């Protein structure tokens, strides 16, 4: 019941901002939809591992939404209600030429990082069979951040062609090739998140550059991603019995395309509840800065930055 109520609330909050702005990717509308909708999904309690959240957890979730909602409203009014991003303003600050070099350069760097990881580690995840955690093992400290930076290229490609592209067919063809390489890398890494992020970011960029975009574009993108998501899950040597067993799903026959995303979403909220109950003190944001400590190498210089207890729920 609580899950259904939160789904309705998420839909209403998104529709409220969409009707007012006419913007499919209205920032507050999207945040409200995914934040509250994610809680609704977690409240379905499809797994035996899930428990009721503490009152403090509910208060934190509510304050996060209210704080974002009010802050956005205040800033939106101060800025004249012009939340919509338009490409006209962007075109005044940029040209096709620098975008071309950025796309090609980032593709080369990302591909080189991927090849380096594959050479040093001795395998490519998508080619490995029977090893469910091949993706987790395909990781070199610091370098992997460079490898996955390819997820920015599809969105940059959208910007490139939105500005007219190049008069040279070869240059345009090279950009398309770069976009294909950027999609291929997450597939070779069997990284579902990176693939989904790359596609969704490109779709959002396209929507931001157009005045009128059909909501069906999002539906088509999601439908197109589902088979890719399932295939990558299979390539990871994850079958539905394995996943439903690990996540202790109440219904052992739950389809894999429901189990996988559901647990990713639900676990975020359940993990937060676990930390609310177990953490003796607030980390003051230090845990959230782990990517900085890893990329900069500071975690090796000062291990205390990442020396936090691991809680299992």
Predicted regions and their residues:
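Membrane-anchoring hydrophobic segments
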Residues: 1-177, 212-215
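Membrane-water interface signatures at transmembrane helix termini and the short loops
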Residues: 39-51, 189-193, 197, 302-313
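Hydrophobic alpha-helical membrane-insertion segments
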Residues: 102-114, 224-230, 293, 297
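Small-residue-enriched transmembrane helix-hairpin modules in multi-pass membrane proteins
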Residues: 130-139, 228-313
